[in-house]
C-alpha cells in the first residue's frame, strides 16, 4: 500500500506542471496508453472542485451510447475495504461489537477445528491485516479452494472455516500482512452480531445513511451500458464481458463493490470531514482511528502519520479496473481517480494525473 504513497511524495517534490488543463493531460495519457475510461474527483470538506469522466465504457465499441458519463459505475476493488471498515465502525458506535471483540468469542464452536494460532484474533486484527490470515490476493489461491455451496454469505462462512484451519502467515517482523481473506472473516463477525448479511448491512448503512448507491460485482452485470473492465490477452487489451466466470463473491467484503464517481466522492468527502474533526455519521474520533489509529495500515486505510504529514490512501484493483484514493489532512483535500483498466501503463497514468491534480489544487 505505502509503495504508491511514497512514490507520490517523491514525485510531487519535483513537479513542473502548472495548473494545466487536467482533461487535456488525461486525454493524452489515455490515448498514449490505450486506457478506455478514466474518472477523477477533487474533494474538499465543503465542495467538489473537479469531477469528470472521460473516454468510453469499452475498447470494442466507441459511440454515444458507450461514452463516459457521471452515472458510470467503477469497480472499487480493495477500496471496498474502507467501506467494510466504515460499516464495522458504525456497529461499534452502536454497541453491537467492539474493535477488540475476539472472533472465537462469537464462534466458540469453531475452535476445535481451527488453528490455535488464531484463537486471540480480534475484529481490529482482521480489518488491519494483523491476524496473519493467508493473503488470497491472487487468483491461483482461489482456484485451489474446495467448491463451497449455498448463497454468498454461506459460502463465505465455509471459506472462513477453511482459512482458520490453515497455517498463519510467517511474517518475520512486518507490521501487517495484507489479506483479502481476513475481511471475509471480519464480515462474518458483523453478520453474527446483527443477524444481517454483509450485503444488507452495507446497503443499509451506505445507501440509507449516506444516500449513495452501491453495486456488488462488475458494473456491466448491472447494465450492458455500464463500463466494462479490461485485461490483457495476447498483448491486446480486451473487455471483460458480463457472462465471464470471474467472480469475487468469497472476497466481496474485501474488494467487490462498485460505485459511481459522484457517490464514491460523497463517501470520501464524509471521511475527509471526519478526519478534520467533524462528527457526522461517525464520530470524528472514530474517523481518526479508521485512518490513523494503527501504524502504516489502520482500518481499510494505509497511512503516513507523523509530525509533518498526515496522509491516508488506498488503491484497489481486481485486475480489470483500478481505483485510487488519497486524503491529505494537512491540506484539507482529497483525490479519487478511477479507470476501467489496471495495466501498468494505466496505473502510471493515474499517478501522473494525481500529481497534476495535486499541483493544481493543493495549496
Name each region found by the language model.
Residues 1-22:
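Bacterial Sec-dependent N-terminal signal peptides
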Residues 22-74, 96:
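Short, conserved catalytic-motif segment at the N-terminal edge
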Residues 26, 40, 46, 75-103, ...:
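Active-site SXXK
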Residues 47, 56, 115-317:
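Short, surface-exposed loop or secondary-structure junction motifs
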Residues 98-114, 208-209:
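Short, glycine/proline-biased beta-turn/loop segments that scaffold the active-site neighborhood
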Residues 307-310, 341-363:
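Short, gly/Ser/Thr-rich active-site loops of penicillin-recognizing serine hydrolases
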Residues 319-323:
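Short, surface-exposed coil-to-beta transition loops
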Residues 324-341:
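Short, well-ordered beta-strand elements
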Amino acid at each position: 500500500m505505502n509503495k504508491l504513497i511514497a512514490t507520490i511524495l517523491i514525485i510531487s517534490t519535483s513537479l513542473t506542471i502548472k495548473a494545466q488543463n487536467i482533461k487535456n493531460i488525461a486525454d493524452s495519457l489515455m490515448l498514449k496508453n490505450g486506457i478506455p475510461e478514466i474518472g477523477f474527483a477533487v474533494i474538499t470538506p465543503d465542495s467538489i472542485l473537479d469531477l469528470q469522466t472521460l473516454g468510453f465504457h469499452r475498447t470494442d465499441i466507441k459511440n454515444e451510447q458507450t461514452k463516459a458519463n457521471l452515472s458510470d459505475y467503477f469497480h472499487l476493488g480493495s477500496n471496498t475495504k474502507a467501506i467494510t471498515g466504515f460499516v464495522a465502525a458504525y456497529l461499534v458506535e452502536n454497541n453491537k461489537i467492539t474493535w477488540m471483540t475476539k472472533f472465537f468469542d462469537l464462534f466458540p464452536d469453531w475452535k476445535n477445528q481451527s488453528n490455535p494460532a488464531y484463537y486471540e484474533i480480534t475484529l481490529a486484527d482482521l480489518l488491519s491485516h494483523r491476524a496473519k490470515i493467508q493473503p488470497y490476493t491472487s487468483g491461483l489461491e482461489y482456484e485451489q479452494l474446495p467448491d463451497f455451496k449455498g448463497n454468498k454469505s454461506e459460502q463465505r462462512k465455509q471459506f472462513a472455516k477453511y482459512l482458520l484451519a490453515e497455517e498463519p502467515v510467517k511474517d518475520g517482523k512486518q507490521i501487517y500482512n495484507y489479506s483479502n481473506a481476513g475481511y471475509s472473516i471480519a464480515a462474518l463477525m458483523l453478520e453474527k452480531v446483527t443477524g444481517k448479511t454483509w450485503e444488507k448491512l452495507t446497503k443499509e448503512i451506505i445507501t440509507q445513511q449516506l444516500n449513495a448507491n452501491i453495486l456488488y460485482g462488475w458494473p456491466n452485470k448491472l447494465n450492458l451500458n455500464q463500463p466494462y473492465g479490461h485485461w490483457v490477452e495476447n498483448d491486446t487489451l480486451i473487455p471483460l464481458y458480463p457472462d465471464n466466470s470471474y467472480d469475487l463473491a468469497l472476497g466481496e467484503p474485501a474488494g467487490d463493490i462498485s460505485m459511481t464517481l459522484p457517490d464514491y466522492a460523497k463517501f470520501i468527502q464524509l471521511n475527509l470531514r471526519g478526519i478534520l474533526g467533524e462528527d457526522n455519521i461517525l464520530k470524528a474520533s472514530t474517523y481518526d482511528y479508521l485512518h490513523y489509529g494503527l501504524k502504516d495500515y489502520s482500518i481499510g486505510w494505509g497511512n503516513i502519520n507523523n509530525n509533518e504529514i498526515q496522509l491516508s490512501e488506498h488503491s484497489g484493483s481486481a485486475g480489470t479496473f483500478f481505483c485510487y484514493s488519497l486524503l491529505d489532512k494537512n491540506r484539507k483535500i482529497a483525490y479519487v481517480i478511477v479507470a476501467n483498466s489496471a495495466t501498468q501503463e494505466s496505473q502510471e497514468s493515474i499517478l501522473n494525473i494525481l500529481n497534476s491534480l495535486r499541483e493544481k489544487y493543493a495549496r
